[in-house]
């Protein structure tokens, strides 16, 4: 299995090389050269497998011959052994045909653990095999950073530098990162928003001289090895609900389009048919793009769902590549327009193909709060604000006779202020999160300028 760039002008790479890469040299994102396929019987069989067994069956199709199966399975077992749910991503029934997929049972209480606990182990395996080192750089709107740090802390062959927007995460999200004092980890509070951190990250990874000299790699969802493990829970969930013999719909709270693209990838593998619902907050570039065909960067609004306070959705480029018939030149031109003019128009054919699978719903913070209050009152179940957005979208788009799954992406204790404001009481706090209150923090505050971050990273690499 090789991987090609969405912009069509970079050499193909195997999985193990993509795993420790950032952007392709032409600025694009790596994608599978072809989509591996599951037969109907293989999908049905997933419903009876353990989660690690299902993960092996899916992920071996993406790693190909790059990772021996015993090594891949060992990494999977170790990664998901740290989750506090036996089935890793439990499915909870919320009503007639409506379900929540709980993705927050990992060590940092967010869905990012599903991918990053595994990615950390696979990176360590690959670097040890090659007797190599890597400097991981990441940008986080809240959850990616802590999950990446938890998966990579203490590794001898890996340095980690994570940028977060200063003052724009919850206190707990910040402390999950900044209280980690391992020598191989550094945190930067960037004086800007998440889109600024993501722009800087792409500048750094796009600098081929810097990337090669410092052996830079990414843990954001621009890295295909971040997307691949998330495909697994779409397949296991769809199989439990009757796929491929019935349709299953998913509503996904998303800002950067990575999680929902994993659902699309599962569909491309033949795992299930159904609608994919993009659930956005007031930062609604994806909802606007799907409704009007115009992808235009607007102002970033601060909301109670900070992990979705994003205007530039990096993984949308992957969908554009697929919906254009894998026309790398067209994707490159449109992304050039975005960089130059902060907007582009989806060609009619591309827009029509996207509409075959995707719908979108914009959910305000007040609507999310109402859903949190209603769910707590009626069921006793506590939602975090991101999950509430997904549940609102799911209820709006639920079809008769078709199972609808809303993704529960974070534990409510990560957002105590929003939960308390909506429900009247703070959520119970797991001991691991409560302990953060008394721990010292370490981070550096820098301007939202690539040159400043570059100098910091070079100094860290030279230590």
Region roles according to the model:
Residues 1-463:
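PLP-dependent amino-acid enzyme catalytic core
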